Curated annotation (Swiss-Prot):
It is found in: Cytoplasm. Belongs to the GST superfamily. It comes from the Bacteria. This is Glutathione S-transferase. Its EC number is 2.5.1.18. Its main location: cytoplasm.
Length: 24
């Protein structure tokens, strides 16, 4: 459960990072 939660958070973090990069 903790592993899955961690993966979910990591995936969300990556999405936010991508959005910021695209935003410039």
């Amino acid at each position: 459960m903790l592993k899955l939660h961690g993966f979910s958070v990591s995936n969300y973090y990556n999405m936010v990072k991508l959005a910021l990069l695209e935003k410039g």
